[in-house]
């Protein structure tokens, strides 16, 4: 045991002596010390929920324990294992492509995200089958594989599962997982540092490229150009490409047509929110993994209240378990309702404002907020502005003059014209229907 570990053992013993057993087990039992130098200490908690709770409620308590044990006041920071994972990914240096997948991926793939831990339901069955087929026969089954769906529904889990499977079954396979935002940032840095050849070598000399959240490249013309050539080289060399997005290729605005076409070469599959049976199965599996003793009626309550995505569902279970230990009460439906009252209250439909609409439409069509009020009439701004006016009439109770006022003081007749134009276009334009469906989802989520 290292010196700092010994100090932390003493601090924990001090804390344990002063806390109720249930509180200690809930908040401190799984913590570790990561850094202790220059009057600073970094403590690692197993989850973001616990790290935030410690940072908010126990910093002074921890400070007192350190003072008693080492006689020194320290600057204390609490992080989670997830924080460290993200930081490692950001800081990981560019490595030579000759490395094996086992060397490439320790900080890129979540070890929990495998096919074995994925809960299959009606909303993801096809995507799971396609992902497994790709993992078993890279570049032979479906290339590219394009998985789309909302936040927290399992897209990234499936991509990580593909990566793990290939690493396990294909010796020395080169696998890279990256978000499209990080791809763009690395590309920009490679230009700045005059290292574009290194960048290209890193992403074009792999057996499997897993790229997450491709919709982030919308409007990023230079990065789209670079990814276009990366895609072509990998595809021509029979290397597997797996892409995820929050929407289908044809619904990503300002995506170059040549990229859109290539994304449609292989298989496009979607994941949808889990049904009740799947949500219960997810909770049951998670409770078994975490050794959480939860009765069926309490599990059913969580599953009926948290319907949006898997991430929130699992987070709710963790919160309920921690709350039960903290208050030292049996885990039942009443306690679940008490523990989740804030989450359930915030999950109810919110009142939509015109600014909410402008922000969502602006993000979708890459338009700045101030452009909705500007006098500009270019098509790239005028059309999104009309969309926003249409949605303002459909989703809010504001009067026509009030809507016009929020769009730079425009006359109410302009709002009527915009509403009628979009309404008529929706009758024949399926693509526009899908775009509005995605925007409305963003507004109300």
Curated annotation (Swiss-Prot):
<feature type="region of interest" description="Domain IV, binds dsDNA">
    <location>
        <begin position="325"/>
        <end position="445"/>
    </location>
</feature>
<dbReference type="InterPro" id="IPR013159">
    <property type="entry name" value="DnaA_C"/>
</dbReference>
<dbReference type="InterPro" id="IPR010921">
    <property type="entry name" value="Trp_repressor/repl_initiator"/>
</dbReference>
<dbReference type="GO" id="GO:0006275">
    <property type="term" value="P:regulation of DNA replication"/>
</dbReference>
<dbReference type="Pfam" id="PF11638">
    <property type="entry name" value="DnaA_N"/>
</dbReference>
<feature type="binding site">
    <location>
        <position position="155"/>
    </location>
    <ligand>
        <name>ATP</name>
    </ligand>
</feature>
<dbReference type="GO" id="GO:0005886">
    <property type="term" value="C:plasma membrane"/>
</dbReference>
<keyword id="KW-0235">DNA replication</keyword>
<dbReference type="InterPro" id="IPR003593">
    <property type="entry name" value="AAA+_ATPase"/>
</dbReference>
<dbReference type="InterPro" id="IPR013317">
    <property type="entry name" value="DnaA_dom"/>
</dbReference>
<dbReference type="GO" id="GO:0016887">
    <property type="term" value="F:ATP hydrolysis activity"/>
</dbReference>
<feature type="region of interest" description="Domain I, interacts with DnaA modulators">
    <location>
        <begin position="1"/>
        <end position="72"/>
    </location>
</feature>
<comment type="subunit">
    <text>Oligomerizes as a right-handed, spiral filament on DNA at oriC.</text>
</comment>
<feature type="region of interest" description="Domain III, AAA+ region">
    <location>
        <begin position="108"/>
        <end position="324"/>
    </location>
</feature>
<keyword id="KW-0238">DNA-binding</keyword>
<feature type="binding site">
    <location>
        <position position="154"/>
    </location>
    <ligand>
        <name>ATP</name>
    </ligand>
</feature>
<dbReference type="Pfam" id="PF08299">
    <property type="entry name" value="Bac_DnaA_C"/>
</dbReference>
<dbReference type="GO" id="GO:0008289">
    <property type="term" value="F:lipid binding"/>
</dbReference>
<dbReference type="InterPro" id="IPR001957">
    <property type="entry name" value="Chromosome_initiator_DnaA"/>
</dbReference>
<keyword id="KW-0963">Cytoplasm</keyword>
<protein>
    <recommendedName>
        <fullName>Chromosomal replication initiator protein DnaA</fullName>
    </recommendedName>
</protein>
<comment type="function">
    <text>Plays an essential role in the initiation and regulation of chromosomal replication. ATP-DnaA binds to the origin of replication (oriC) to initiate formation of the DNA replication initiation complex once per cell cycle. Binds the DnaA box (a 9 base pair repeat at the origin) and separates the double-stranded (ds)DNA. Forms a right-handed helical filament on oriC DNA; dsDNA binds to the exterior of the filament while single-stranded (ss)DNA is stabiized in the filament's interior.</text>
</comment>
<keyword id="KW-0067">ATP-binding</keyword>
<dbReference type="InterPro" id="IPR020591">
    <property type="entry name" value="Chromosome_initiator_DnaA-like"/>
</dbReference>
<comment type="similarity">
    <text>Belongs to the DnaA family.</text>
</comment>
<feature type="binding site">
    <location>
        <position position="152"/>
    </location>
    <ligand>
        <name>ATP</name>
    </ligand>
</feature>
<dbReference type="GO" id="GO:0006270">
    <property type="term" value="P:DNA replication initiation"/>
</dbReference>
<dbReference type="Pfam" id="PF00308">
    <property type="entry name" value="Bac_DnaA"/>
</dbReference>
<dbReference type="GO" id="GO:0003688">
    <property type="term" value="F:DNA replication origin binding"/>
</dbReference>
<keyword id="KW-0547">Nucleotide-binding</keyword>
<feature type="region of interest" description="Domain II">
    <location>
        <begin position="72"/>
        <end position="107"/>
    </location>
</feature>
<feature type="binding site">
    <location>
        <position position="156"/>
    </location>
    <ligand>
        <name>ATP</name>
    </ligand>
</feature>
<dbReference type="GO" id="GO:0005737">
    <property type="term" value="C:cytoplasm"/>
</dbReference>
<dbReference type="InterPro" id="IPR018312">
    <property type="entry name" value="Chromosome_initiator_DnaA_CS"/>
</dbReference>
<dbReference type="InterPro" id="IPR027417">
    <property type="entry name" value="P-loop_NTPase"/>
</dbReference>
<dbReference type="InterPro" id="IPR024633">
    <property type="entry name" value="DnaA_N_dom"/>
</dbReference>
<keyword id="KW-0446">Lipid-binding</keyword>
<dbReference type="InterPro" id="IPR038454">
    <property type="entry name" value="DnaA_N_sf"/>
</dbReference>
<dbReference type="GO" id="GO:0005524">
    <property type="term" value="F:ATP binding"/>
</dbReference>
